[in-house]
Amino acid sequence: MRKTRRAALLLLAAIAGPALAGPARFSDFRYDGRAQEQVTPGPDDYRNPILSGYYPDPSITRVGDTYYLVNSSFAHYPGLPVFRSSDMVHWRQIGNAIDRPDQFDFSGLRSSRGMFAPDISFHDELFYLVGTCVDCGGNFVMTAKDAAGPWSKPHWLPFEGIDPSIYWEGERAFIVNNRAPAEPPRYEGHRAIWVQEFDWRTLTMTGGSTQIVNGGVDIRQKPAWIEGPHLLKREGFYYLIAAEGGTGDQHSEVVFRARDLRGPFTPYAGNPILSQRSLAPARPHPVTSAGHAKLVQTQAGDWWATFLATRPYGPDLYNIGRETFLLPVAWRDGWPHILEAGKTIPYAAKRPPLPVCDIDAPPTSGDFAYRDRFDGPRLSMDWIGLRTPKAPLYRLEAGALVLDGTTALGDLSGAPAFVGRRQQHHVATISTDLTYRPETEGDRAGLAAVQSDRSFLFFGVTRKDGKPQLALMVREDSDHDRLVAAAPIDPAKPLRLTIALDGGTARFAYGVDGRETVLARDVDIRFLSTHEAGGFVGTVVGPYAWSARVTRPISN
C-alpha cells in the first residue's frame, strides 16, 4: 500500500514537471532625484516645472479658493491624475479619475494611445471631465461630486477628433475641440477647431457644430496640428487659445478672439503668445516644446497659465516626458501674453499672490527623494501600470510588494505585472530589495524602466540555460530583448538592485550581504527618450515580474 502511494506521488510529480516560480517580493523602494539645472528660488519664488516628469497636457480650474488640475495618462492605469492646490505651487494628488477597470478598457493599446488631453471644469456643484480615449471609444464626459472621486463611467459624445474642453456661460455650456477641417485636408497636420453646444443636464450634444478656426493662425503658412483649444470670455470678447505646431520642439500657443462664440475669430497679430522654438537649441539647460496652455483667473483677479514643456538633456532628448509649467498672464491691448518672443521660460519666478499652503505635500518639483516600504494597505495613487488589468496585479504583505506575472512587457494582449513611478528627474537613483527564485526558463523579476511597449529595459533576476543569473536586458524600439550584461547569483540571498540615471546614461549595480557590485556602467539609455522611442509618455520605473507559469493568483 505504501509502495503504491509512493508510486502515485512520483507519477504526479512527473506529470506536474519542474517546480514553478514563486512570486517576486520587493521591499524598500527608494527614489532620489535632482534636476540638472541647479536653481535656488528666492523666498517669494516658485520653481518650474510645478509637476516634474510625465505630467503632460495640464488642464486647470478654480473652485472658490481651490485649484484643481488634471493631466493626460494615455494607456497607463490608474489614469488621469487629479491634483489640488490653494497656491498653484504646492500640489497634492488627490485621486485618479480612472481608478476602476469597468470605466475604460485599454486592452490591446500601445502605451501612447488611450487618454488624450482631458479638461476639468466645475458647474452647479459638480465636476466635469471631458477627454478622448484614442482607439478605445472616442470622446467622453465624466462627472464627480468631489474631484478626488469617485468619477462616473464615461458618457460617450458623438463627435470625432480629440482634446475637448467645456466652456461655461451662465446655464449654457459649449464644447470646443480639434476635428478634421470642413474641406479636404490641404497638407499633413491640417486640422480645425469646432464648437458645439453641450446639454450638461443630459450629458448630450445639441444643435449643429461650427468650424471656428481652419488650420491655424494663417493657413497659407500651413500651420500644423491646431489642438488643445480652450475658450474664455473677457470684456465682451470670446478668446480661443490653442496649441499649434505639434507637441515637439516647434510647439507654441496661439490666441484668437471674436465678438460671437461662433466667430468669426481673428488671430492675434503678435502670435504666438508662448513658444521656445526660436531660441538657440544649444543654450544651457533649455526648456523646449512649450504649449498646450490653459488660463485660469485667481480669486484676486490675476491670470495665470499652466502649460506643458520639456527639459532635454541633449538635442531634443528627454526621457522623463512632458511636464507641467506655470507662468503669469498679462493682458495688453485686449490680448493675453504668456511670454514675450525670444525670452526663455524661467526655472524660478515670483509666486502667485496667494496664501502659501500645503507645504507638507509630497514634493512635485525641484530636488527630492522618497521611500516606499510597502507597509500600507494599498499602493499610493502615484503608482501606475500599463493598460487596464483584468485581475489584480500585486498584493502587499508584511512590508513587501508581491508580484506574479503572466503578461510580459511588450505583450499588448494584457497588463504586465509592472507597477512603477514616473521618473521625475534626469539625474536619479532608484533602488529596491528583491527576493526571488526563478524556476522556469525565462522567468524574471526586477526593476524595469519603461518608455513604450518597444522601448524598455529590465534589470533583475532571470533563469537562463537552467541557471539563475542577474541580467540587464534592453529593448530598443524592437520586439526583441538584447542582453547587455549578466552575472551568476545565489537566488537564496536577497538582492539590492540599484539603477543610477544620468541623462542618457545609466549605471546598474547589485548588492549582496551589504556589498555592492557594478554590473554595467555608462550604458546608453537614449532609447528611453521620446525622440528615440516616439509617443507622448515619459519613462516609468518600478518592479516587474514575469513567468510563463504562475504558482498562485494574486488575491487582493
How would you name each of these model-derived features?
Residues 1-2, 20-556:
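Carbohydrate-active catalytic/glycan-binding domains of CAZyme proteins
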Residues 4-10:
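N-terminal export leaders
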